[in-house]
Regions:
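Non-ligating segments of multi-cofactor redox enzymes
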Residues: 1-243
Length: 243
């Protein structure tokens, strides 16, 4: 290689500090996108209403959405300590303001009933510190049965997996014995699962353990979460008819 060619090669070669691997570059870019979105769009008034999404399930102890977005610095500490891989960075579940903030993805992991680690490591208290006993009473969402996919409902097959794994002291998933007929016209008694919205905390273990996959026959949505009294599936006597 002559001196001119070497000079051209050296000139075109990026500096060492610019040679990032794609994995690191993606992580840094995503982090900057989250921070940039926060700076560019800010936390809009009543962001939680405007960006409501059933998939926007925050970890237990998360503040009300506007306060949460104002405090969360997208550090990822809660994601790192989650033992069941349930907490992941948000894409657009919470709008641009919520980029890279932590959300529960209950198709991938569940909130362990005996765990409160995410609340212990949050440096800004966007997820407030809570003891396990308090955490166990916080509703982060509500499970619901997809009757078109559930084995007892759709196929008259016996399955009690969701109820077996439900961790609440009084099971949030219970069964009703129903007499049905199979395709041959024979009478069968099957146990069809139901969800008690008063007892369900939305932990997602039923979704993870469900033998039906992609998607599961029981899934969790953010409706019913403790942190937002307006995000409820049921009308109470006090709220009925009020604007």
């Amino acid at each position: 290689m002559n001196r001119f060619s070497k000079w051209i090669t050296d000139f075109l070669r990026p500096p060492k500090e610019a040679r990032l691997d794609l994995g690191r570059r993606a992580v840094i870019g995503a982090g900057l996108a989250g921070v940039g979105g926060k700076l560019l769009f800010g936390v809009a008034p009543e962001a939680s209403r405007r960006t409501f999404n059933p998939a926007l399930i925050r970890p237990p102890g998360a503040l009300a959405e506007d306060d949460f977005l104002a405090r969360c610095i997208r550090c990822g500490e809660c994601m790192k300590v989650c033992p069941t891989n349930a907490i992941h960075p948000a894409s657009l579940e919470g709008g641009f303001e919520g980029l890279w903030t932590p959300v529960m993805v209950t198709s991938l992991g569940y909130c362990d009933y005996e765990c409160n680690l995410c609340s212990q490591v949050c440096p800004t208290h966007a997820i407030r510190q809570i003891e396990v006993a308090e955490k166990q009473k916080i509703k982060i969402g509500l499970a619901y049965i997809d009757r078109s996919r559930c084995l007892p409902w759709a196929y008259s097959k016996t399955c009690i997996v969701c109820e077996e794994h439900c961790p609440t002291p009084k099971k949030a998933i219970w069964f009703e014995e129903v007499e049905v007929r199979n395709i041959q016209g024979e009478k069968l008694t099957v146990k069809q699962p139901r969800v008690d919205p008063e007892l369900c905390i939305g932990c997602g273990i039923c979704e993870v353990k469900c033998p039906v996959k992609a998607p599961a026959a029981v899934r969790v949505a953010s409706v019913g979460e403790s942190r937002n009294p307006e995000n409820q599936i049921l009308l109470t006597n006090d709220s009925y008819g009020q604007g």
